[in-house]
């Protein structure tokens, strides 16, 4: 089975169910194939969400894989340490601190700041010195939520 075909079908199903495919890995062959799927959504992902996606993917995969092949499907949330890929992922992280890399006037800048607003294609952050930083989503290279233990 072709990894690109599986990924495309996976993206379609995940999207139809109202989630985003934020990570995909297909490895192995024959009886040792593993499909790892990482999903996210506008709300936090829970075990029920993963089970729903898994059930729909398994229905489709059974028709795609040869009877001589077997596979293991793992569906999970991406985890807090993964960068956000879609602007729709940001609102649920309002008032959280981010590590951000972004493009500004053909240079790459990095900062840590608190997300204070999401408006269409722009994200507003509050910097350490209390200034508002507005970044267009298209200019963000990498944005990760910083884990806080306080």
Predicted regions and their residues:
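Short Lys/Arg-rich amphipathic alpha-helical segments
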Residues: 1-112, 116-150
């Amino acid at each position: 089975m072709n990894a690109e075909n599986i990924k495309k079908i996976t993206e379609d199903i995940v999207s139809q169910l109202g989630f985003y495919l934020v990570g995909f890995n297909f490895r192995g062959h024959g009886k040792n194939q593993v499909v790892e799927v990482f999903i996210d959504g506008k709300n936090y992902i829970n075990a029920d969400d993963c089970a729903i996606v898994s059930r729909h993917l398994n229905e489709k995969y059974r028709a795609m894989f040869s009877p001589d092949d077997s596979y293991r499907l793992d569906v999970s949330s991406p985890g807090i340490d993964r960068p956000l890929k879609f602007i729709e992922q940001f609102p649920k992280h309002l008032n959280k601190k981010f590590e951000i890399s972004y493009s500004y006037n053909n240079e790459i800048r990095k900062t840590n700041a608190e997300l204070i607003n999401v408006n269409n294609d722009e994200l507003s952050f509050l910097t350490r010195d209390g200034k508002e930083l507005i970044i267009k989503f298209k200019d963000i290279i990498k944005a990760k939520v910083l884990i806080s233990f306080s």
